[in-house]
Design a protein with these regions (language model features):
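Residue-level signal for inorganic ion chemistry
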Residues: 17, 55, 134, 159, ...
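C-terminal charged capping/lid subdomain of soluble metabolic enzymes
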Residues: 72-75, 171-248
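Alpha-helix initiation and N-capping motif
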Residues: 64, 68-71, 82-86, 99-103, ...
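Active-site segments that bind and position negatively charged phosphate/pyrophosphate groups
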Residues: 87-199
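Structural motif
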Residues: 61-66, 98-100, 148-150, 210
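Short beta-strand segments
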Residues: 15, 53, 131, 218-221
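A glycine/threonine-rich phosphate-anchoring loop and its flanking beta-alpha core
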Residues: 2-92
């Protein structure tokens, strides 16, 4: 995608995603980027594909860890936008249950993302909600040098931690963290990843939702509804530190 946006000032792009994560997330929306030494996706553009071809049959070939990687993003959609979809996922018997209704799952996820992107292509408002779990998730990825945990594993743990922070701030219902933790564990994803406060600080400093001393933190008002809350970065770090202490 980044190459298509860059070569000759842009050439047509067709996406043919072959993992669950790319089918429900990165192939839809037009964000194209490459990683830099300083962090993920720091050089990029918005470049919409002319066509996205999704074949759910290719998912049968994925190792369980790669399938689970995509399930983190699937679960995210239920958390931020569709309580009924979250309940539907909760009733699935792991990977087998999801694959039994995979076409509906793909349509639901892609539809939700497309609806957001149509209204906020450039990620200045509503689209920020799609980053639920990602600020902390990027901290986990970078802290472990992008080797120990996959993107989906990091996002899963980030969603769980963000839900706990939301409860502390009085924004998120008390039962939400446990429900998300149960869901991610069902699909073989971690609900916690050890991380230092300095790693969190580095990730928050690089987060594109930040402006000056503030950052928009994506929290849940309830399961199925997210909100972007402006916070001082140091205040967010203080909340993270408290949650980390409570989990020792």
């Amino acid at each position: 995608g980044f190459a298509a946006a860059t070569i000759l000032r842009g050439v047509p792009l067709i996406q043919i995603p072959t993992t669950l994560l790319s089918q429900v997330d990165s192939s839809v929306g037009g964000k194209v980027a490459i990683d830099l030494k300083a962090g993920k996706n720091l050089a990029g553009a918005f470049w919409q594909p002319k066509l996205v071809l999704i074949d759910p049959d290719v998912l049968d070939s994925l190792p369980n860890v790669t399938f689970a990687d995509g399930m983190a993003e699937v679960i995210k959609y239920g958390c931020i936008a569709d309580r009924t979809f979250f309940r539907q996922l909760n009733q699935c018997d792991g990977r087998t249950g999801v694959m039994e209704q995979i076409e509906q799952v793909l349509r639901t996820c892609c539809g939700m993302k497309a609806d957001v992107v149509i209204r906020d292509e450039r990620d200045t408002g509503l689209r920020m909600l799609l980053n639920f779990g990602h600020t902390l998730g990027h901290a986990y990825e970078k802290a472990y040098h992008y080797e120990t945990y996959t993107h989906g594993q990091a996002v899963a743990a980030g969603m769980c931690r963000a839900a706990e922070i939301g409860v502390r701030l009085g924004r998120t219902p008390a039962e939400a963290p446990e429900r998300i933790q149960t869901m991610v564990r069902k699909f073989g994803l971690p609900d916690r990843i050890p991380c230092t406060l300095e790693a969190y600080r580095d990730a928050i400093g690089l987060d594109k939702k930040g402006v000056g001393s503030q950052i928009h933190v994506i929290l849940l008002q309830e399961l199925g509804q997210a909100v972007a809350v402006p916070m001082e970065k140091e205040a967010l770090l203080a909340q993270i530190a408290e949650v980390e202490r409570e989990c020792l």
